From Swiss-Prot:
UniProt-recorded name of the protein: Spanin, inner membrane subunit
Coiled coil: 24-93
Topology in the lipid bilayer: Single-pass type II membrane protein
Residue ranges annotated as Cytoplasmic topological domain: 1-2
Transmembrane intervals: 3-23
Organism: Enterobacteria phage T4 (Bacteriophage T4)
Annotated GO biological process: viral release from host cell by cytolysis
Amino acid sequence: MHVSNFTAGLLLLVIAFGGTSIILKHKVERLETSVTEITKTANENALALNNLRIQYNYIDAMNNKNREAIAAIERENEKLRKDAKKADVVAHKPGLVEKQINNSFNKFAEDIQDLSK
């Protein structure tokens, strides 16, 4: 049985295309698997990023709340320092303190009378 050069060439060409198609099919399957894995990883990373964003917002809110609390404490400390300086005045001038209290009470009483008119 004699095979012509054309037939042999055609047969080699068919075998080459068949082999190439098998190789390409395996590559496509591996790429599909890779795409699936990458998509899964991307979704997991997106979820983790969203969780981090939620945690950051919570920490930021707590940080702002702490700043406000610290500012309030500092204001109160400053007031206490000023009041502590007045302790000597109160001890040495009780009449002045009594006069200030009476003035404040009189002003309060006048305000009440004005409101009741």
